Each structure stands twice: as structure tokens, then as C-alpha cells.
């Protein structure tokens, strides 16, 4: 390579010439010799990248460049390398699309060449094996002994000649005229019969002529015409003339006698049978019955045929009695021999009786011979004959299939005749995703895998014992680690980081096995097959042939959702193991004690084995080897038995499935649901609850939900089947499956709940759970030594007040929070860096590295930040000299702030980027407990107190709230994120701009301060003392309305249901993202422990975490920083509340049709119209729409506590007294909330209903109703009879009611009443009173003339579409969101701009999603079915 010439590693590299030619010219011999091992004869891309800017400099070059080479490596990966002056260093791969495409094609060509070479070698090997087998075949044929020809003895010749001569004597058979019966005078009997017939012959003839019909006359004419005109020499007559030669029995018998003497294995018996068949006159009819006989029954038949020669009737009688006597006297024989003998005797009886009938009627046995021969031919033609041979290898796998030469034409004809018929259906299309498949390559072989979630799923036998396997995707090779293998034949691999953007297959929520699809890669080709599947326990079977490489392939339904993982086949049927969501999570490892016990047992087994081996004689080794071989043979036999057992099970299931309709016992009507679980179809299922509807307004529905919705609509078109209420009711299920009438749970019971997954409480009968003796549990110390406390822990212990250590028996160690690197921009969404990011322990090294050397600064740094850099450098030098670094955080903060405002990178970020080596981003690791947990004191509800520090500067807490302290937390307090969704570029430009007054929420510290205003409007009075009569009336109305809550129960904490994908609050949120991660790490043990602690009398103070809600609101509120706050408590505290109130909440959701609370209510399927009609049916003249302001925050604490007490009075009496102190502690923490803000400040809230507690909506409903009852009595007096005509529906602060009377100045008086008495805010204009319900709104819908819902704020919906606060993942989600808006706009005017715009957008997105399975739009009929219900459920 000459100096200055471009360097090329190979001819393909020169031909493609990817990258920069200038970079190729910079290559030196040293750089060439140290090049990484790229694929031979492959191109590379050369780049000359600028490393940095040098200013000022004495030279002419301001830029420092480095050569970067990108290409495919020999290990199948794709990488980039930069030369640092000494060697090539790997960097993050640079994407060159042309290079990647070329490498993919080259890799495929190399793979095809390798396959061709291997195929040629295999072909040569197989040709050599064929030659060897041919030689072996010839040698074995020579070794086969040839049978010696049987010698013909003279005695058989003489015997055959004599019998043939006797048989061929004329008249030598039973029906010759010279033969008579011995016991019966046949001539006399026939003469008597003839005389009897000739009597009155003339009379008989006259009667016959008198009864001649027209058909008889026509038949006579036809016979005369045939006789006159049909030619005598017709070819049919010639054929029938020569056919009678088949009756030339004598010649045929002579030929059979010669053949019998020459070839028969029993010539004596066969010759006697020929002679007796001639003697009896049965002749040819005897021959087809011979295969049915044994030797004994053959001689019985010969004897009876000889008897038939002498006396016909005696022979027939004996023949009929022979099977009967044989059944009795031959019963001592074994089954097979017994059946053969009886079959021969029955054949003899049929021959003798049938032959006599034929001889008597026709004079010949030809008809009997034809019948027996036809039956044998049909039996032979319809018998199943193997159509192919299957060649298997040593493992039992089918290698090849060879068709047999014998083709049963009749069998195929009858089979095709059964299967033929008029086509009654068409095959369905199936959805496949080839991009979600990959090839798993291991040293043992190849298999197929597929992407699902964060894993690659394949069969466990494909992975084998390997810890790491190669994953081939689109020609590139990646390495993946085996994450988890459950007990099933399934393996889960960790998905490499570069493969995260690939397509994913989802698990089927509603499995449908009627049509399954198997997708796999075989020899780098995609193969697809569909078939019907049957379920056998945890496995599937289907008629699909398996080829090498298909193991681990996904078995999907017609929608492309995964049902099972393909395994292998055992012949005709393919097999797969069903995959469940629970299979993705590994079972929690056994505890340390269990591991130690297993280790002890293993050591004992080894010790016993060593003792036995020591006494074993060496000479026994050969027998051991033989035993080893016998064990291996038995394993093979067991394998074959297992395969046959599986095939027989599959065959039984298929036969039972086919015969089920015929075996079902019908007694006049169909039994619906008896003995099985099913859904109440007449009552229907709610499509959308109110919570789901509110979520629909913001996010829309995903693709799977829409497809299920459409399937539901199609299924409803035929109506719902009838059912009996008695069949649907299950006596064992009382509607509340977790708790019986007399069951109580004792939380003092010591139970091990250290499982990885939440489990339901045990289903018990009416028995009380007896607690075990209380034992003080001690932590197991496996380290056997006490570690020295860190300085941080000692400081925390010293600073802890004595009153904070309330629980002496629970020795806890303070947790040292995880210390993360300062992140000035990553968590502040573009605002100024958080102060705490810079306030860490500075030292001399930090000070030196915060500013680079002068020659490392860019020209832009000097121009924009020159003065500030000089100032900071002076501060750094002073800090190093004085060892006082207190001024550094503020100085660095100001410098980074100026850099950010000028568009430059912050200096603290530069230090992080420099010190952090480039890493290849991989999959996110699962959350787990920290290593330095100590005594795991973050489990307790008041663990936050141990971490509480003195208060600092107020930033987010208003001045009228106390500042209790500061907690270390790393959360943002700025958010100006307004995402820009590129998918919205597909939508047309809107002409209606009313949506622009809405937008996604953004905030700063002022928004947190502003959010506390929700608790203040006016101070309430002591209304219980001022208005006792009205409060008593409101209590009566509340008890009356919610009387269905009477005798509700407290449930076990492990039986509670809660959203586990929520933050676990502080301090658990430092280690776990969600409660689900916390449960996976620790199970239910902390929950039980804390409940027991409260039950015993402790009263820990719970910490709530506050954050602002990201949603679509008016831009005016965003400018005023008027953002709603949400608080959430520790999940243990929330689940304790669920123990006390979950049963009541569930009952409230079940009574939405008759009660006021509408939590769990669905406006779909006629639900909205039914609710509105319920208010109209009251017959009142007045309808009121009521809209509160700051409802949650202004609820008086006295009223909120009173409602909680009313709810508690509904609890079962025994449990009410038992858990009263737990309930009081729970309510006290609701009313006095210690709240943590993202700034680390801790304050105290004593007002309102917290928005994140377990029963927020339910409590708001009851407060709303109590206030309405108070309001009614305030204006109308406590008139209970008049109150019964009042009705209302509420959802939180939403209220729509009907009343019999309203005062004239109702709006002014009601606003004044709520302000002066309760301190609650109702703005003027928010109380609408009309004489018709039309035009009023409830839950975001306005009622139209047909009592149907119309969106109240379509401009807000349009803003959530065009100005979302969260980017949609793909185009399908955008189309699904538009379908949701089309559904919501079903009853809007056709020319409404929102509805027109949605239709226009659907036409745009539908063109891009023709193959997605989503509908282009919902039809009018579908929209009405969703809103109004099915044919038997239509409400309007």
C-alpha cells in the first residue's frame, strides 16, 4: 500500500467503497496490521470523525479527527472501531444502511455456500452408504435358506384319483333322482302337496283372471313385443349361453384335485373336502367358506355334508345345533381359539341351510356362491391397508415417508365419498408476524424462537444445558442468556438490547383452538401451517408435520396471539405445550433453611453411596456395565410407551369429540350451564365502566380491545340464549367468595407468606381458623458476625429522638438511601437543574475535573461563558487552598444554567459523559431489594421517620402549611414536557380551532404551592350542633339508601385487590418502581406483619407521597399553575383500608342500577338511557345539574369522619368491635396526613378527602348523597314521605337529580348554604335547574331528546388527540383512538366539526392499516349495538 493511496481490504471492499475516501488514505501499515477480525471478502465503511475542537492553537488545524471502521465481525456481530493511536477501540456501532444490507446479503450467500458444501458432503456420504447397503443386501439374500420342494407321495396321488373318480360318477350327488332320504318319503309328501294344489284349480284360475290389473296387461304386451322384435342372435344371449360353463363342476374339481396334490400343505383334508362338496351337491359354495374354518370345524362340515347325502333334514338339524352345542361344550378353550371354532361352526350352519334352500328353489348353489364371494370381496376392499411407511431415526423422529405400492382403491373411494359434500363454509385468514421470529442456534442444533414481552421464548430442549445461546435475526448473530426455564418444556431468554425494537407476539387472553397457526424457520425459510387443535391438559395436538428446526415455534390463533410453544411430533399429530402468563415469572427460590436441609440430605446420600461403593468388589464392574445397558434399553422402551400413550390419548380425545353429539342424552330440552361455569348472557356484560370511560377520553382503546368488542357485536346479532336462573345460581358461591358467614381471620396467626407472587386467601368453610401459639420471630443471622455500623448509620441513630423508637421488640437499622449521580437535565425536562443535583460531597478531585484545561475548551465556551469560567476557576483555586468547597455548588449551578440558556452542554454533564464508558444498552433489569438492606426497616409504615432530616428552604409547600422536615428524594419539580407526536402528521389540518384553549399540563414549583388552595374556600360551622334535626334526617336517608351494605365483612389482607402497577410510595419507591416489584421481592410477609402490629395496638404515622396529575385541561389553568394534586400512601396502608372497605365497595358497584352511586356504572349497552329514564320515571317537574368546585378538598373533616363512621356501622357486629381500633387508626391517618413532596419537603394536611386512598370515589358518593339529603331537608323540611319521590345519581362530585319542589331563588340560596354551613364552593352558573332532563349533563355526557349521550366538551377530546400529553406507540393506537372518538360521537349532529374531522382522520389512517385487522370505521349498526345493546337487551 503506497502512502496517500486509499486502503481496501478486499475486492468487494474496493467495489463497494463505503464511507470516506479521505479516511482510507489515513490508514498506515500499523493500523492495518492491528485491524479487528472482520469477515473475509466483505466491505467495510471508513469514517473520519471529528473528536474535538482545539482553540486556540498554533497550527492551522482546529479539528482533531479519528478514523473509524465499521463492518461485520467473524462472530456474526456488527461493530465500529476507532483508532486511538495505539490500537483499535470498540465504540457504539455506527449505522450504515447500505453496509448493513450488503453484509446481510454476503452473510446469506456464505450461509448458502456452506449449506451447499454440507449438502454435497452429505450426498457423497449417502451414496457411499447406499453402495454398502446394496452389497449387504446381496450378501444377506445369499444367506437366506431356500425352501426345499415338497415331495409328492404316491399315496396322495392314488387317494386323489379314487376320490375324483367316485365324485365324477354320474348321479353321484345328493339331489340326483336315484337318491332318497332315509327317514322321510319325499315322493309321498310331494304327491300329497300336488293333489292339494290341484283341487279347485278352475276356481283359482277364474279368481286370478278377475283380479288382473292394467299393469299386468301392459306387462303382457311388453313381453309379446320383446319376443316379436328383439333379434334372436343378440350378443347378450351369446354371453349368457356360454356363462353356464362355469357350472362344469366336474372339470373344475379335477383341476382342484391336481392342484391340491401338488401344493397343499394338508392334501388329505382338502381332497376329502372336495369329494364331500360334490357328494352334497353344494359344489362351488363350499370353497369361499374354507378360510373361516379350523381343522376341527372343517371335519365337522365334511361329516355333515356326507350326512346331507343320505338325509337332508337330519344334516340341516345337526348343522343348526352345532354352533349352539359348540358355545356350550367348547367354553374351556382360550378366547382366540374359542372364537375361531365358533366362527367355523356358524359358517357350516350357514352353508348347509343356505345350500339346501338354494338347491330346493333353483336347483343350484350359484346364488349362495355369489353372495359369499361378494361379502368377502367387500370385506377385502374396505379393510384399512397402510398407505405409507415411516422411516424413523434412533430418537424415534420421522425422517422420511415412503408410500406403499398397494393402493386400496375401494377404501379410498368410500373415504372420499364420505368426505365429499356441498361446501358449507370458507377457510378463515390468519395473522402472522414473521418479524417476531428468530432462529436459536446451539451446539446441539437449531430451533425457532419468538419475541414476547422482554424475552425470547423457545423450547427448553432446544436450549438444553447451555447458559448462553446464539440468536440469529435477519442474518445477524446475537448472544442471549437463558433467563428462566419453568417445569414445562419452555425456555425464556433475555432479549439483547439491539433486538428490542423488533415486533412482539402477545399472549392470547381468550384462547381459541379451532384454528391454530404454526410459524417456524426451516433452513432459513419461513414455513406456515394451519390446523385444528385439541387440548389435552397442558398440551395441544394438531395434524402438522414437524421438520428439523421447528421446535420452539409459536402456535398462534387466527389473530396472531400466542397459544402454545411447538415441541415435536410423534407421527401424525404435532404437539405443543400451552404457555400462560404465569410461566414468564420464575418461582421464588427456596429459603436458606430449605437449602441447608437439602444440602444435608445430599451429603447423607453421598456418604451412603461412598460406603456402599467401598464394599463393592471390583469384579462386579462388568455386570454393572451390563446393567447400565439394560437401563438404557428400558429408557428407550419407556420413551416408546410414553409416545404411544400420548398418541392413544390424542386418539381418544378426538373420537370422544366426534361422538359427543351422538352420545349426549337428550330429554326434551337443553340443559344450560348445569355443572359448568358460564356467563350470564341475558344480563349481559358491561362494555365500559365509568373508570374505563374516563381513561378512554384520554388514551383511547388498543387494538385487542377493539377486536374483542367487534367480536362481541357479531356474536350478539343472533341474540342471547335462554337460561334458567336456578341453573345459573351456585349454592356453594355466596357472591363473596373470600369470606363466609361465620369465618374470622386472626392476624396474630404466624403464617409464612414469603412467596414471590400474591396468592388469594384460602377458601374456607364455616370454620374458625385456629391461631397457632404466638412465637416471637427472630431474624436468621447467617453471617455469624456483627458488622460494624457505618458512620452514616451512627449519625442517624444519634439524631433519632427517643420517642421515635416506639417498637423495642423490632430492632431496625436505618437504611442508607441509594446515591445516584447528579443528573442536571435528565429529570428536569429542560428547566434549570435541581439544586440537589449539585449539592453533593465535593472534594479536590471533583473541583479539578469540573472544568477542563484551557486548550480543551471550545471557541463557543470562550465567547459565551468566558467571564463565568474565569470566575469559577478562581473559586476552585480558592476552595482547594482553603479546603472549603461550600461555594462550589452555587458557582457550578450558575455556570451550567448559563450554558443551558446558550444551548451548550453543561460542565457537570461533560464530566459524567467523560467518565462514563460507552455501553451497549441492554434490557432493563428486574427490580430487586437492595443489597445493604440491614434489617429491612423500609417495610414498616413509619420507616420514613428514621430518614427524616431537619427542615430546609421552602420551595413547594405554602406558607400556611407546616414544614416538618426534609427527606432525601430524587424527583423532578419542573415539567414543561409537551410531546410532539410524529404520527399526527398523517392527520389533516383541522378547520375547527376551539381545541386550542386546552393543552397538556406543565408545571414548576409554583404549581405545587397552588395545588394546596383546594383545601380552602370558607370555614365550616359546627353543623351537627347547629342543625341536629337536619343532620339526623340526612343520616336516616343515608342508612336507608345504603342498607344493602348491612352485615358486610372485613376480609383478609391477602384477598384484597388493588392496582399493583402503582408507586409503592416513600421509602419503598427508592428501591422498587411498582408495588408488583415489591411483592415479587418480599411477598405478603410485610403486609401481614404490619397489620398484626396495628391490630396489637401500635399506631404508626403513615407518609403520603404527593405529585401533580398529567392531563388535558384549559390553557388558562396551566398559565395560572392550577394543577390537580394526587397523593398516594404506602401500599400496606392502602391494603389495610381494602381489608376494611373492599366488601362494601364491591357491593356498591353491583347496585348502580338501583342505588345513587354510579362507580362501576357503564353508559354502554343502554346503560346511559336506562339511568336517565330512571330519573324521568319519578314524575317530578324539576331536574338539577350540580357542579362543585374543589369538591374533594373542601369536604369538612367532621363530615368525612362521620361518613366513615356510618360505613363502619354497616360492618358485621362481631368484626365491628374486634377491628374498631384498626379502623380508627386508619381514619385518623386519612384526616391527618403527613405528605412528602418531590422537593423532599414534608408537611401535614388535615383537610379534605385524599384523592389516592382506597375508597375515594365511594366516600365522595356517600358525602354527596348526605349533602343532598341535608339540602332537601333545609329547603323542604325533614319530610320523609316527600323524600321518597326524590332521586339522584352521583359519581364523585358529579350530580344529576330530580326533585318534586324547588324554591324560586334556589341557586342563590343553595350556594349560600354550602358556603356558610359547610365551607364548600359552588360557583354561580354551575347550578342548572330545568323542567326537563334534556340538555343537562352527567359524567361528561349531555342528554339529548332521546335520552342518549352526547359529549359535553368535544373540543377537549380533540385537544387530547392533537395536543396529547403522551406519545402514542404506533399507528394502530392512533387508529384505535380515532375509533373511540367515533364511538363517543355516535349521537352528535352529522355536521358537527368534531365528528366530521374524526371521519376524515379515519379515512387517512385506514389507508395505512389495511392489514392490521382493525376496522376502517365502525358502522352505524355497530355503534348502535354498543350504545343500545343487543336484540334482547335493547333499551331504546
Curated annotation (Swiss-Prot):
Annotated stretches, region: Disordered: 756-828, 913-934
Listed InterPro entries: Astro_1A (IPR045835), Astro_p19 (IPR045833), Astro_VPg (IPR045836), DNA/RNA_pol_sf (IPR043502), Mamastrovirus_p20 (IPR022068), Peptidase_S1_PA (IPR009003), Peptidase_S1_PA_chymotrypsin (IPR043504), Rev_trsase/Diguanyl_cyclase (IPR043128)
TM spans (from-to): 156-176, 239-259, 286-306, 313-333, 344-364
Pfam families from the UniProt entry: Astro_1A, Astro_p19, Astro_VPg, Astrovir_pp_1, RdRP_1, Trypsin_2
RdRp catalytic domain mapped to chain residues: 1181-1307
Entry annotated with the keyword Kinase: no
Maturation and modification: Cleaved by the viral and host proteases. The protease is probably autocatalytically cleaved.
Sections of the chain in a coiled coil: 104-142, 587-620
Residue numbers bearing the O-(5'-phospho-RNA)-tyrosine modification: 693
Protein name: Non-structural polyprotein 1AB
Gene source species: Human astrovirus-1
Amino acid at each position: 500500500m503506497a502512502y496517500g493511496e486509499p486502503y481496501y481490504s478486499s475486492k468487494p471492499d474496493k467495489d463497494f467503497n463505503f464511507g470516506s475516501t479521505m479516511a482510507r488514505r489515513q490508514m498506515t501499515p500499523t493500523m492495518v496490521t492491528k485491524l479487528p477480525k472482520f469477515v473475509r471478502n466483505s466491505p467495510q465503511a471508513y469514517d473520519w470523525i471529528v473528536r474535538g475542537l482545539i482553540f486556540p492553537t498554533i497550527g492551522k488545524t482546529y479539528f482533531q479527527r479519528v478514523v473509524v471502521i465499521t463492518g461485520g465481525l467473524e462472530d456474526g456481530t456488527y461493530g465500529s472501531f476507532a483508532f486511538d493511536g495505539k490500537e483499535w477501540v470498540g465504540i457504539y456501532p455506527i449505522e450504515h444502511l447500505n453496509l448493513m444490507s450488503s453484509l446481510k446479503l454476503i452473510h446469506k450467500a456464505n450461509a448458502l455456500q456452506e449449506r451447499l458444501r454440507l449438502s454435497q458432503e452429505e450426498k457423497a456420504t449417502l451414496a457411499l452408504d447406499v453402495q454398502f447397503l446394496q452389497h449387504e443386501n446381496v450378501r444377506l439374500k445369499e444367506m437366506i435358506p431356500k425352501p426345499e420342494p415338497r415331495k409328492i407321495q404316491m399315496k396322495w396321488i392314488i387317494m386323489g384319483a379314487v376320490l375324483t373318480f367316485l365324485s365324477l360318477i354320474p348321479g353321484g350327488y345328493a339331489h340326483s333322482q336315484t337318491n332318497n332320504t332315509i327317514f322321510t318319503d319325499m315322493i309321498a309328501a310331494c304327491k300329497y302337496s300336488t293333489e292339494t294344489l290341484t283341487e279347485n284349480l278352475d276356481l283359482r284360475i277364474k279368481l286370478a283372471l278377475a283380479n288382473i290389473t292394467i299393469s299386468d296387461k301392459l306387462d303382457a304386451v311388453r313381453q309379446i313385443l320383446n319376443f316379436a322384435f328383439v333379434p334372436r342372435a343378440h350378443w347378450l344371449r351369446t354371453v349368457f349361453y356360454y356363462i353356464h360353463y362355469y357350472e362344469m363342476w366336474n372339470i373344475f374339481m379335477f383341476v382342484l384335485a391336481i392342484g391340491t396334490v401338488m401344493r397343499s400343505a394338508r392334501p388329505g383334508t382338502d381332497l376329502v373336502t372336495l369329494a364331500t362338496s360334490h357328494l352334497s351337491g353344494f359344489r362351488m359354495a363350499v370353497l369361499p367358506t374354507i378360510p373361516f374354518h379350523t381343522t376341527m370345524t372343517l371335519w365337522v362340515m365334511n361329516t355333515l355334508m356326507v350326512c346331507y347325502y343320505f338325509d337332508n333334514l337330519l344334516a340341516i338339524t345337526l348343522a343348526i345345533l352345532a354352533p349352539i352345542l359348540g358355545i356350550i361344550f367348547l367354553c374351556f378353550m382360550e378366547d382366540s381359539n374359542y372364537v375361531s371354532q365358533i366362527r367355523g361352526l356358524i359358517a357350516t350352519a350357514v352353508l348347509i341351510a343356505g345350500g339346501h334352500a338354494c338347491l330346493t328353489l333353483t336347483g343350484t348353489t350359484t346364488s349362495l356362491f355369489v353372495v359369499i364371494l361378494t361379502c368377502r370381496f367387500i370385506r377385502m376392499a374396505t379393510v384399512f391397508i397402510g398407505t405409507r411407511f415411516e422411516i424413523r431415526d434412533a430418537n424415534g423422529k420421522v425422517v422420511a415417508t415412503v408410500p406403499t405400492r398397494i393402493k386400496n382403491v375401494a377404501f379410498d373411494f368410500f373415504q372420499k365419498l364420505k368426505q365429499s359434500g356441498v361446501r358449507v363454509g370458507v377457510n378463515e385468514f390468519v395473522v402472522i408476524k414473521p418479524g417476531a421470529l428468530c432462529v436459536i442456534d446451539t451446539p446441539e442444533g437449531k430451533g425457532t424462537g419468538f419475541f414476547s414481552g422482554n424475552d425470547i421464548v423457545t423450547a427448553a430442549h432446544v436450549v438444553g444445558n447451555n447458559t448462553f445461546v446464539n440468536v440469529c435475526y435477519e442474518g445477524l448473530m446475537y448472544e442471549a442468556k437463558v433467563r428462566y426455564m419453568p417445569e414445562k418444556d419452555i425456555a425464556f431468554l433475555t432479549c439483547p438490547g439491539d433486538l428490542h425494537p423488533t415486533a412482539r407476539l402477545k399472549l392470547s387472553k381468550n384462547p381459541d383452538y379451532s384454528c391454530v397457526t404454526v410459524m417456524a424457520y426451516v433452513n432459513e425459510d419461513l414455513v406456515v401451517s394451519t390446523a385444528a387443535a385439541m387440548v389435552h391438559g397442558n398440551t395441544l395436538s394438531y395434524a402438522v408435520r414437524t421438520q428439523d428446526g421447528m421446535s420452539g415455534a409459536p402456535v398462534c390463533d387466527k389473530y396472531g396471539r400466542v397459544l402454545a410453544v411447538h415441541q415435536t411430533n410423534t407421527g401424525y399429530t404435532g404437539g405443543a405445550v400451552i404457555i400462560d402468563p404465569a410461566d414468564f415469572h420464575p418461582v421464588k427460590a427456596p429459603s436458606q433453611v430449605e437449602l441447608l436441609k437439602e444440602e444435608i440430605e445430599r451429603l447423607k446420600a453421598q456418604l451412603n453411596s461412598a460406603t456402599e461403593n467401598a464394599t463393592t468388589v471390583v469384579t462386579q464392574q462388568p455386570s454393572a456395565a451390563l446393567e447400565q445397558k439394560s437401563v438404557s434399553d428400558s429408557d428407550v422402551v419407556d420413551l416408546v410407551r410414553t409416545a404411544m400413550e400420548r398418541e392413544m390419548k390424542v386418539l381418544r380425545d378426538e373420537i370422544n369429540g366426534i361422538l359427543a353429539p351422538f352420545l349426549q342424552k337428550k330429554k326434551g330440552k337443553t340443559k344450560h350451564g348445569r355443572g359448568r361455569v358460564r356467563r350470564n348472557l341475558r344480563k349481559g356484560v358491561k362494555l365500559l365502566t365509568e373508570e374505563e370511560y374516563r381513561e378512554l377520553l384520554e388514551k383511547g382503546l388498543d387494538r385487542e380491545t377493539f377486536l374483542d368488542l367487534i367480536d362481541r357485536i357479531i356474536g350478539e346479532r343472533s341474540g342471547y340464549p335462554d337460561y334458567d336462573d336456578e341453573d345459573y345460581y351456585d349454592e356453594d358461591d355466596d357472591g363473596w367468595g373470600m369470606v363466609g358467614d361465620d369465618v374470622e381471620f386472626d392476624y396474630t396467626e404466624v403464617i409464612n407468606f414469603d412467596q414471590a407472587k400474591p396468592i388469594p386467601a384460602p377458601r374456607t368453610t364455616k370454620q374458625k381458623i385456629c391461631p397457632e401459639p404466638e412465637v416471637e420471630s427472630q431474624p436468621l443471622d447467617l453471617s455469624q458476625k456483627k458488622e460494624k455500623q457505618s458512620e452514616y448509620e451512627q449519625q442517624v441513630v444519634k439524631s433519632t429522638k427517643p420517642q421515635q423508637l416506639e417498637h423495642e421488640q423490632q430492632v431496625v437499622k436505618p437504611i442508607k438511601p441509594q446515591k445516584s449521580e447528579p443528573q442536571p437535565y435528565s429529570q428536569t425536562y429542560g428547566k434549570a437543574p435541581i439544586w440537589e443535583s449539585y449539592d453533593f460531597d465535593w472534594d479536590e478531585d471533583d473541583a479539578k475535573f469540573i472544568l477542563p484545561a484551557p486548550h480543551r475548551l471550545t471557541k463557543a465556551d470562550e465567547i459565551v461563558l468566558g467571564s463565568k469560567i474565569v470566575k469559577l476557576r478562581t473559586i476552585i483555586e480558592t476552595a482547594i487552598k482553603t479546603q472549603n468547597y461550600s461555594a462550589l455548588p452555587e458557582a457550578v449551578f450558575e455556570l451550567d444554567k448559563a450554558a443551558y440558556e446558550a444551548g451548550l452542554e453543561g460542565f457537570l454533564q461533560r464530566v459524567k459523559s467523560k467518565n462514563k464508558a460507552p455501553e451497549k444498552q441492554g434490557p432493563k433489569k428486574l427490580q430487586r431489594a437492595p443489597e445493604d438492606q440491614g434489617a429491612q426497616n423500609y417495610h414498616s409504615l413509619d420507616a420514613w421517620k428514621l430518614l427524616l432530616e431537619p427542615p430546609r428552604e421552602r420551595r413547594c409547600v405554602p406558607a400556611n402549611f407546616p414544614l416538618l422536615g426534609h427527606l432525601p428524594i430524587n424527583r423532578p419539580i419542573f415539567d414543561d414536557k409537551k410531546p410532539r407526536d410524529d404520527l399526527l402528521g398523517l392527520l389533516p389540518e383541522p378547520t375547527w380551532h376551539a381545541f386550542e384553549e386546552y393543552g397538556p399540563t406543565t408545571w414548576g414549583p409554583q404549581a405545587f404551592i397552588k395545588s394546596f388552595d383546594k383545601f380552602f374556600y370558607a370555614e365550616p360551622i359546627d353543623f351537627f350542633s347547629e342543625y341536629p334535626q337536619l343532620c339526623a334526617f340526612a343520616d336516616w336517608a343515608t342508612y336507608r339508601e345504603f342498607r344493602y351494605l348491612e352485615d358486610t365483612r372485613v376480609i383478609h389482607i391477602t384477598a384484597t385487590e388493588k392496582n399493583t402497577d402503582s408507586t409503592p410510595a416513600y421509602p419503598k419507591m427508592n428501591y422498587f418502581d411498582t408495588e408488583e416489584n415489591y411483592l415479587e421481592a418480599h411477598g405478603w410477609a410485610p403486609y401481614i406483619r404490619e397489620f398484626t402490629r396495628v391490630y396489637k395496638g401500635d399506631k404508626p404515622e403513615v407518609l403520603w407521597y404527593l405529585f401533580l396529575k398529567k392531563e388535558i385541561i384549559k390553557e388558562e389553568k396551566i398559565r395560572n399553575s392550577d394543577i390537580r394534586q394526587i397523593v398516594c400512601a404506602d401500599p400496606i396502608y392502602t391494603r389495610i383500608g381494602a381489608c376494611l372497605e373492599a366488601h362494601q365497595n364491591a357491593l356498591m358497584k353491583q347496585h348502580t342500577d338501583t342505588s345513587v352511586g354510579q362507580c362501576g356504572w357503564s353508559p354502554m349497552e343502554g346503560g346511559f338511557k336506562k339511568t336517565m329514564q330512571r330519573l324521568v320515571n319519578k314524575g317530578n317537574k324539576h331536574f338539577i345539574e350540580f357542579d362543585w368546585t374543589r369538591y374533594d378538598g373542601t369536604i369538612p373533616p367532621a363530615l368525612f369522619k362521620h361518613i366513615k363512621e356510618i360505613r363502619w356501622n354497616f360492618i358485621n357486629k362481631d368484626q365491628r368491635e374486634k377491628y374498631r381500633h384498626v379502623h380508627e387508626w386508619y381514619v385518623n391517618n386519612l384526616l391527618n396526613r403527613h405528605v412528602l413532596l418531590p422537593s423532599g419537603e414534608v408537611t401535614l394536611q388535615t383537610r379534605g378527602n385524599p384523592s389516592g386512598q382506597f375508597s375515594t370515589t365511594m366516600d365522595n358518593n356517600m358525602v354527596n348523597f348526605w349533602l343532598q339529603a341535608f339540602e332537601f331537608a333545609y329547603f323542604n323540611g325533614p319530610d320523609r314521605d316527600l323524600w321518597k319521590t326524590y332521586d339522584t345519581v352521583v359519581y364523585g362530585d358529579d350530580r344529576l337529580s330530580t326533585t318534586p319542589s324547588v324554591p324560586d331563588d334556589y341557586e342563590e340560596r343553595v350556594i349560600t348554604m354550602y358556603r356558610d354551613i359547610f365551607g364548600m364552593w359552588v360557583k354561580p352558573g354551575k347550578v342548572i335547574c330545568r323542567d326537563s332532563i334534556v340538555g343537562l349533563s352527567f359524567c361528561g355526557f349531555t342528554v339529548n331528546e332521546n335520552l342518549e349521550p352526547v359529549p359535553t366538551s368535544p373540543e377537549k377530546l380533540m385537544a387530547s388527540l392533537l395536543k396529547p400529553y403522551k406519545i402514542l406507540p404506533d399507528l394502530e393506537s392512533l387508529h384505535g383512538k380515532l375509533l373511540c372518538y367515533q364511538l363517543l360521537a355516535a349521537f352528535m349532529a352529522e355536521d358537527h366539526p368534531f365528528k366530521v374531522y374524526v371521519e376524515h382522520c379515519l379515512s387517512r389512517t385506514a389507508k395505512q392499516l389495511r392489514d392490521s385487522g382493525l376496522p376502517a370505521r365502525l358502522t352505524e349498526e355497530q355503534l348502535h349495538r354498543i350504545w343500545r345493546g343487543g336484540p334482547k337487551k335493547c333499551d331504546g
